[in-house]
Regions:
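Metallo-beta-lactamase
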Residues: 2-15, 21-22, 27-30, 43-46, 94-139, 146-148, 172-173, 177-180, ...
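Residue-level detector of beta-strand structural context in well-folded domains
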Residues: 12, 34-36, 116-118, 141
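Short, hydrophobic/aromatic-rich segments at coil-to-beta transitions
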Residues: 18-25, 73, 122-128
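Active-site metal-binding motif and surrounding structural segment of the metallo-beta-lactamase
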Residues: 50-101
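Short glycine-/acidic-enriched loop or helix-start segments at secondary-structure transitions
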Residues: 56-57, 84-86, 108, 162-163, ...
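Structured loop/turn residues at beta-strand edges in well-structured enzyme cores
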Residues: 69, 123, 188
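Generic beta-sheet signal
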Residues: 77, 97-100, 116, 153-154, ...
Length: 234
């Protein structure tokens, strides 16, 4: 199983809820890169998108559920998640939105860019800093809509297998296991959390987040051991 898929993508829907849905373009890849379409009154916002055949029809379907046929914009929430944001934005004639404080991203996007802080356009989603550090290099923004209880965490949390130790169903990223973003994420008690690797948690997400943060350090070496074993065994 490759870390990242290549070639023709095979879009698989995840995370359908009243207000959006997600997709994984390469379901068989280890990283399980997840993207999301958030339907708002301002149109559909695409979060950290990976392109795939059938994506535009998928976006239209998500928009139809909310009574909109417009793509409002594309947003990059992690400095490493430029993915296919520029190509998709150009195709739909919209800007790529990049947090104002995030460095080294806007100049690498071959598309019009809008820098933003606070609310993402008129989406109802408020942006906030999850992590902005040089060691490890990490610039991550979260999104939260208090009206729908939807939280987007693009990297610090995930459900892909390499995020999970023991019986965890939502885990902290391996690189952050010893320094989890507990102070930031524990402020939220969302109904659902959408993540950038794997399917999200669509109910009682606040409890799942608290459990993940609480077990982060305790389960760190179990996760590292599992990862090392998988690497050795292939």
């Amino acid at each position: 199983m490759p870390m990242k898929g290549r070639g023709p993508a095979d879009l698989r829907e995840i995370d359908r809820f009243d207000g959006g849905a997600g997709w994984i373009a390469y379901p068989d890849e280890t990283m399980e890169r997840a993207s999301h379409a958030l339907a708002t009154d301002a149109g559909v916002w695409l979060v950290d998108p990976v392109d795939a055949d059938g994506l535009d029809a998928f976006i239209a379907d998500v928009g139809a559920d909310a009574g909109t046929d417009e793509v409002a914009g594309v947003v990059v929430c992690l400095d490493r998640h430029k993915r296919d944001a520029a190509a998709i934005a150009r195709r739909h004639g919209v800007d790529v939105y990049v947090p104002r404080w995030m460095n080294g991203v806007a100049g690498e996007l071959d598309a019009p860019v809008t820098r933003f802080s606070g609310e993402l356009g008129d989406s109802g989603f408020e942006s906030f800093v999850i992590r902005d550090s040089s060691l490890p290099p990490w610039q991550e923004a979260g999104l939260y809509d208090p009206d729908t209880g939807t939280l987007v965490v693009p990297e610090s949390l995930g459900t892909a297998a390499y995020f999970l130790a023991d019986d965890e169903t939502l885990g902290v990223h391996p690189m952050l296991r010893l320094t989890p973003p507990a102070e930031v994420l524990s402020r939220y008690d969302p109904e659902r959390v959408l993540v950038g690797h794997g399917a999200g948690v669509l109910s009682a997400a606040g409890e799942a987040i608290n459990d993940a943060l609480a077990s982060s350090k305790r389960n760190a070496f179990a996760l590292y051991g599992k990862t090392a074993k998988q690497f050795i065994m292939g």
